[in-house]
UniProtKB/Swiss-Prot annotation:
Disulfide bonds: none annotated. Could be involved in insertion of integral membrane proteins into the membrane. The keyword Transit peptide does not apply. It is found in: Cell membrane. It comes from the Bacteria. It is a peripheral membrane protein. This is Putative membrane protein insertion efficiency factor. SMART domains: Haemolytic. The lineage of its organism: Bacteria, Bacillati, Bacillota, Clostridia, Eubacteriales. Keywords: Cell membrane, Membrane. It holds the Pfam family YidD.
Length: 71
């Protein structure tokens, strides 16, 4: 139940907040928000949330980015 709520919040971000950015800013594929949805859906809120946090912390100009799916 909590897992669905977290995914719903991330989808709200994708739908209403992310489009407000003028340029695409995620260096990864899939995007960090989609990665968070995949991780929470697969591993649950605690482990998936930790994986998503690590991914977001890697998303900066000095990291090359690229293809990084949930494993």
């Amino acid at each position: 139940m909590f897992r669905r709520w977290v995914i719903y919040i991330i989808r709200l971000y994708q739908r209403w907040i992310s489009p407000l950015k003028t340029m695409p800013s995620c260096r990864f594929y899939p995007t960090c928000s989609q990665y968070a949805i995949d991780a929470v859906g697969r591993y649950g809120v605690i482990k998936g949330g930790f994986m998503a946090l690590k991914r977001i912390l890697k998303c900066h100009p000095f990291h090359p980015g690229g293809y990084d799916p949930v494993k």
